[in-house]
Regions:
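Charged/polar interaction segments and conserved charged motifs
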Residues: 1-2, 57
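General structural signal for secondary-structure boundaries
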Residues: 20, 59-62, 74, 93, ...
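Amphipathic alpha-helical binding modules
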Residues: 77-122
Length: 122
């Protein structure tokens, strides 16, 4: 089951041409997906979350991302290690500005929707 933010990011990925923009959107989608998976009503298990973070680190490391986005995603991954809904909400709110600066307003709007939803779950 996907969230409105995930759906919007997947649509943006599908509409973008190959290149750094598409890879940035894909990386953002991966992080948003990992963060939203920590939120109630059905958060993932700690073991599953650790696996997701390991896969996330491997996948993001292989992408050609603009430096500001790469730094933001690395920081987000570190915050997600605590595996709490509060960490997920923090990560989503902190990703809005880098998403807007690097990927555009539509990507930032998708992250903003996810951040608002996360705050409602706290």
């Amino acid at each position: 089951m996907s969230t409105p933010a995930e759906d919007k990011l997947v649509t943006l990925i599908a509409d973008s041409a190959r290149g750094p923009q598409r890879e940035g959107l894909f990386a953002l989608w991966l992080v948003v997906r990992a963060a939203e998976a920590l939120l109630p009503p059905a958060p993932v298990s700690a073991k599953n979350h650790r696996r997701r973070l390991q896969a996330l680190e491997t996948r993001i490391g292989s992408l050609a991302l603009p430096a500001p986005l790469k730094r933001a995603l690395a920081a987000a991954r570190q915050h997600l290690e605590t595996a709490t809904p509060n960490a997920a909400a923090l990560v989503l709110s902190q990703l809005t500005a880098p998403a807007r600066d690097v990927l555009g307003v539509e990507a930032a709007d998708a992250v903003t929707v996810a951040a608002r939803s996360a705050r409602l779950h706290l």
